[in-house]
């Protein structure tokens, strides 16, 4: 590992944090039904705090002042609903870049020097909650990515096992969440259906108000599915009291598919969902624990394990008698916020057994396969990153000033942190990057963003990649009753 990531790990241990707008991904709707005082992560006051039952994160409450610690009840809480609510979030980004579209075909210097501009709608999501009763809640979220419709792929066993694509377009429409929650007690509740896998910081807090940049942190989404959502069963709750308060979540879901693992994104493309049914031969097990007992601070750890990713292949014959290919992912993250500063950070480390065998077998993918044949797949992958922003209005103590938050972010990631022989790691995947920018919180859930990013590739051996971006995003509830 280079000196940069080592230095950053020390830096992250002191700085890692995040906005209290998404303080706790597992409290969910339980507090909307059970009047248990909890610590407000923004002010530190004890309040009836109502997390978001759709995303599992606390809904951003833009425009609410954090200057006063005052108690509020259900009828005063703008996030509370009696039976139904409909909301969503969305992002639009324009970027101005000085590099080409592929650093792997730009010659010995990496990405060629060129100027190009892009504009996109990375995602637009619609979310709803419906209460069948005070203890049974239906939650759903549909996300539109890149403004288009995805594709359905079928494996036609009657046609020599060939892949058949039914519909094709540049973007994707996905059911990101669809689950039913049974509220039992503050310490134990159950959920079944399609839900977010809360591994890493970004998956647990993926709405645009919960990161400063115009786009999501790059390191996590280059290694892990993002947003990572699977079908299964979960238990969650809150235990302890005062400074010893913890939120937990454990789940069993459809495991990742080794067919999708590749050189550039490690296991990020291994998420199932290409087919009409997911393989559940080797489930994935995920757990998350958050310490939320101190004012404005949340420290969390998450773990994911799949006993045999090759068993979830749609064509198990790819892997023959290679044996199990277990996958482990460990993540630590922390969040801190007060009136003046917001900081967040995350470290992700992953280990894939039999990565050398998987790499050699991926050459068997047919040309019609939806999977990449770009190898080798690494044994270990790593990402670490953090960002810090300050609220100028509160620092200057000028209530009439616009709410401006300058920020800086650092990230290091490498989807080929360690590659097994005889394969060799590609240094063009080793990335260190700085992002600096400004957020303008317009209010009522709307935010304007601007940032500049510079990437150092392969420890500076290849051409840097630089870009300036502008973005606009929103998060909020449109209808409640």
Role assignments for model-derived ranges:
Residues 1-6, 241:
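Positively charged n-region of N-terminal signal peptides that target proteins for export
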Residues 226, 276-283, 322-326:
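Active-site glycine- and acidic-residue-rich loops that bind
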Residues 260, 266-312:
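Loop-centered beta-sheet repeat module
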Residues 7-17:
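Bacterial N-terminal signal peptides
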Residues 20-105, 481:
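N-terminal periplasmic/intermembrane-space "pro-region" immediately following the signal or transit peptide
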Residues 97-101, 113, 163-168, 178-181, ...:
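Outer-membrane beta-barrel pore domains
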Residues 77-97, 115-258, 281-286, 290-298, ...:
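Outer membrane beta-barrel
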Residues 118, 145-148, 225, 277-279, ...:
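Solvent-exposed loop/turn segments connecting transmembrane beta-strands
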